[in-house]
Every structure is written in structure tokens, then in C-alpha cells.
């Protein structure tokens, strides 16, 4: 085989490998969309919702975890994203209060089982935990890829913004729940707004049991350093939104810069996204 033919063969092999990688990869977004607060003025949900939908459609995640979504927001997203379904309930066990809903592209994934627990000493009951200001929940499901039939557990949560003890104990509870639920050691993702910065002890506790998605990523962070913007146009440095994983390959990790589609932020958090292979 001459040099030209060898080079052509090598390019074909590389292209095929790249195609397989792309075909098997899955995009997952975690997004605190800022609850629909009637006292918000220019940042009112009605002024933001269509831009949020545009961002989601542009990035086309197979799985989408939402924090701070009230029922009217969840319903709106559900109505705009064709082929998507979701799991999750409100903090009251029905439709009131914040959801930690998980949307999924039903053409790509199926849900085998799902549930929600409360971040408290009585996780199976509607309850508020420790020094938390509000009831807090974690919604999870076992998702099956319809092509490969591979399965992955996904947990979505939003820790309390006031209770320091609650945040610490929420980590311990979730790790306990993961051990109880994931008895077959399937790949796993924990995502959400944890209201914790990377140096805080509860984050270190998570890292002792799960992989930090950013540290595991095959490529450097794409986008701003932080995730919380507070609707300010200043540099974003505060990181409180995360992906933690187990038994997964992270191809890329992104803090999506919403200013690329809008002159102002469309939530007080940036959406974060990973591309995974498993």
C-alpha cells in the first residue's frame, strides 16, 4: 500500500471513530430558570421564556434538569419542546411550589422508573429539613437509551439557599439514597443548583463519592468561570451549579453564555451542559 492510500485509510478510520463518538454522545443541561416572580420587572418570566426556549432548542439536550420551575413554567416548556416528556412533582407533592423536573427527549430515551424525595430527616414525606427556609426536593429517574439500551440514573435537585446545615445534610442524604437506589451500579448523574461554592466542605464530600464532571471532562471548561449571574452583566465568577457523575465519560463541560443570544441574562443562573458517552 502506497503512502497516499495509507493516508486515505487513516483519515477514513478517524472519521468513522469520530462519527461513532458523536452518535453515541448525549447532551444534558441543568438550568435554574428563576421562578416566575410577579414582582420581577424587566426580568419577568414573560419577558424571558421565549429566549429560554430558543436557547434550549439551539443546544438540543436529550435530558434537561430544571430548577425553580413552577407549574406554569414547566407546562410552558413542555408545550414548546416537541417530543419531550418530563418527570417530577412540586414541593407539596403535587403541583405547588418549585419542581426539580427532568425533561427528556422521548425519541431518544425512555424512563424505566422515577420518584421524588424530600431533603429532610423524613425524605419520603412532604417535609422541610433541618435549618432550611423552604421544602427542598430531589427528583430522579432511571433512563434507558432507546438505541443502545444502556441505562443511566439521573438525579436533579436544588439545595436550600439559607440553611447551611441543610446543605451539608442534603449531600449526605443524596449519597445515601444513591447507594440505596443504584444497586446495579449503573452510570449516574447528579445535577442541580447546590447553592455551594467549590471549596465548601459539602462539595468535597460529594467529590469523595462521585466524579466532578468538570474535572473529568476531556476538554477544558467552555464559557464563563461561574454560573450565578444575578442578572448582572458583571463578570460571572460564582459557581454554584454542578454535574457530578459516576461511570461516565465526559466529552465536554459548558457554562452556556446566554448573552450570545440576548443583551441581558435570561435567568439569574447560566445553564450548564455536559456531553457524555457511556
Show the residue positions of the predicted features.
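N-terminal, active-site-proximal structural segment of metallo-dependent hydrolase catalytic domains
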Residues: 2-9, 18-80, 91-98, 172, ...
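A structural micro-motif
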Residues: 26, 84-85, 109, 152, ...
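Active-site beta-strand/loop signature of hydrolases that rely on acidic residues for catalysis
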Residues: 26-33, 52-77, 103, 141, ...
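Acidic/histidine-rich helix-loop elements
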Residues: 30-50, 119-133, 160, 225-234
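Solvent-exposed loop/turn segments at secondary-structure junctions
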Residues: 33-36, 70-73, 91-95, 108-109, ...
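Short, well-ordered secondary-structure micro-motifs
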Residues: 41, 77, 84, 165-167, ...
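Structured beta-strand-rich core segments of catalytic domains in phosphoester-bond hydrolases
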Residues: 63-155, 255-256
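Metal-dependent phosphoester-hydrolase catalytic domains
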Residues: 165, 169, 176-188, 196-278
